[in-house]
Amino acid sequence: MSLIKVTNLTFAHDGSYDNIFENVSFQIDTDWKLGFTGRNGRGKTTFLNLLLGKYEYSGTISATVSFEYFPFHVEHKENHTIDVVADIDPDFEHWQLLRELSLLHVSEDVLYRPFESLSNGEQTKVMLAALFLKENRFLLIDEPTNHLDLHARKLVSDYLNQKSGFILVSHDRAFLDNCVDHVLSINKTNIEIQKGNFSDWWENKERQDNFEMAENDKLRKDIKRLSEASKRTSGWSHEVEKTKNGTRNSGSKVDKGYIGHKAAKMMKRSKSIEKRQQSAIEERSQLLKNVESSESLKISQISYHKQQLVEFDRVSIQYGEREVCRDVSFSVEQGDRIVLSGSNGSGKSSLLKLICGEEIPYSGTLRIGSQLKISYVSQDTSHLRGNLSDFARNCGIDESLFKANLSKLDFSRVQFEKDIASFSGGQKKKVLIAKSLSERVHLHVWDEPLNFVDVISRMQIEELLLEHSPTILFVEHDSEFCKQIATKIVELKD
């Protein structure tokens, strides 16, 4: 066991006016299984890069271990997988590699295939196995679940549960719950560490947020009451002082000593009220700093004139010699929230693209309603560039609704002035989701919409879909999201 000590860390990207981290201090035990959470753009990947020494910063980061980053860059993907592993760890023991691959349910034959021929899931598992071969290393695992199907996520999560000594960036709640014992969270104003899994951290956060909101409401009422009391006391004191100075025309004799004593007493009480009021204001100013905004999202909806929107009848898709799915039959009706489930390569994305009009060779019958309007969220975000106003204009969507939803998804004002190409992966996916919510359509078709999207934003999207019940056909491997949202599951077999 050793410690990674972060002391007074301050960092900002070149050209930025705002610090991502400011005087941050905390300690990490190198035996921990540390989940790393925070909203998109808060600096999770930046912090990992600081540990790797990629950026200059002020403050200190001290550690007696070396850091390894996942996913690592593979320069020659055409090489055999075993050679890729050797590039990462030239001294690896073959039997140890086979042991790690066995834990991940990966067969030995993948080692003798070109790395580029492996599926995304196989590549992820091989890279993790290679990194855990190294001793005295603390692993920085950055979003390993992207593009992994449910089965692969469970395997990788179980594998990490047997390991220790890593930071894991993931937005999959079930995945984190199964394999972390501490949570490092980047909040609005600080970074904190708590013991437990993600659900433990979230429960504590909700409890703290609710307490602070109740305390804030109580202090707001106290401040108002004290303000009114201060005005009354000040008024009484002023009236008493006028009496002392003989300004009243009652004709009675004034006892200036008694009146002066009473005025002083009133003044003392007024100062006491002011002091209590100021104390309440200061106490209130310390609250709600890390309460995350999770305002309700809005959606632009229209109804279709028929109950059934789409029907697949024994649809099969084949690319050359490779058949990706066979005899798929199901229908999409108004109000359905259907998830396509199946392993990677089972044809889920191909079926979505087929609905959206992409020319994909298929057999069987596909019936799409006449004049059906569809909004599509693709996995790919590489085409996104330009500013948000131009993007909204080019897409023909309501710019105010589009930007309002992005703001609710934690986009700051400065974000609206940036080029979309500079956004983080999660922020780019939010752009596509906000666009889809702004389109007046009958059917939403979403292909892995939540890749890179932070947990709180996922919860906001869940609340929207449950409240407004738009018709949606989607592919997603976040088991918690699917459990909350799907009204039907269409299982695709290999």
Language-model-detected regions and their locations in the chain:
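Coiled-coil termination/hinge junctions
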Residues: 283-310
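Extended, highly charged alpha-helical segments
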Residues: 76-78, 83-100, 178, 185-293, ...
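ABC ATP-binding cassette signature C-motif
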Residues: 1-216, 300-494
